[in-house]
Amino acid sequence: MALKATIYKAVVNVADLDRNRFLDAALTLARHPSETQERMMLRLLAWIKYADERLQFTRGLSAEDEPEAWLRNDHLGIDLWIELGLPDERRIKKACTQASDVALFAYNSRAAQIWWQQHQSKCAQFANLSVWYLDDGQLAQLSEFADRTMTLQATIQDGAIWLSDARNNLEIQLTAWQQPS
């Protein structure tokens, strides 16, 4: 018998002072049985960083041909493709050719550093690719926010993401390994 995804609900209030964007959203995240709590919370953080009414989570781990989240336009084109982890060159190329903008969130300190050394020059070929890195310590702190029902406040200013709920406060500094040219 196949294991089912665990459903998480998040009510998120985003005040993105860098983009002058303010948004309240009720999100549903399906955590695949093979997905860690840290990875699920990184998906949520990626959504917060690029918050938009049209930004949607996809089937994620269940669908190899889709990103973790995407922002589709009215013509069904992909304006933003959000990827997590350490994808191979083929996956990066696919994302960068199908979407106007691609945001990759790398994590897992040791593996990510090695992956970046091996893929940095290949990633530089894609002018629409952003590569963000979140270290293990911040990712562990972020995972403490995980709850089946979450109410989160997020403020983004000067590149920092301030996240809070009824119990926790956290400042997250994503490291920009690559920005679009």
UniProtKB/Swiss-Prot annotation:
Transmembrane portions of the chain: none
Gene3D superfamilies, A to Z: Restriction endonuclease-like alpha-beta roll domain
Extent of the signal sequence: none
InterPro entries: Restrct_endonuc-II-like, YaeQ, YaeQ_sf
Name used for this protein in its record: Uncharacterized protein YaeQ
